């Protein structure tokens, strides 16, 4: 199967940060670790990101910014970059999705989708 020139594989894992949360104040904080891999055939640089964060009440926040954690990773084909960040929502359950904006070495801009993933506190048995 022939690879596409402009393609970024994105995987995300989220965990609840109990020590940084304040349920009594409706603040639930989650860390998420993103692993991105250039699965295309052309080197590319990450320019920006767009996140859509939604809580269980349907409140949606859009976060748009340059780079990720202060960096603009440059990825050759087959190279990966990983980072961890955090988000706080007002409910114990929510979700995030979005996209990364990149520019390939040949000048072609492209967007890589970030599939929706859950933000959820672990269930407890009493």
From Swiss-Prot:
Name of a matching Pfam family: DUF525
Domain ApaG: 2-126
Entry-linked InterPro entries: ApaG-like, ApaG_domain, ApaG_sf, Uncharacterised_ApaG
Protein's recorded name: Protein ApaG
UniProt source species: Methylococcus capsulatus (strain ATCC 33009 / NCIMB 11132 / Bath)
Lineage start: Bacteria, Pseudomonadati, Pseudomonadota, Gammaproteobacteria, Methylococcales
């Amino acid at each position: 199967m022939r690879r596409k020139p402009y393609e970024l594989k994105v995987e995300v894992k989220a965990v609840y940060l109990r020590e940084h949360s304040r349920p009594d104040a409706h603040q639930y904080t989650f860390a998420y670790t993103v692993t991105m891999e250039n699965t295309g055939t052309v080197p590319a640089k990450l320019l920006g990101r767009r996140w859509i964060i939604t809580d269980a009440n349907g409140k949606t926040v859009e976060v748009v910014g340059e780079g990720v954690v202060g960096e603009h990773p440059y990825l050759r084909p087959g190279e990966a970059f990983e980072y961890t960040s955090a988000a706080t929502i007002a409910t114990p359950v929510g979700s995030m999705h979005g996209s990364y904006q990149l520019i390939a070495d040949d000048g072609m801009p492209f967007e890589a989708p970030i599939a929706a993933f859950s933000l959820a506190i672990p269930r407890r048995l009493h």
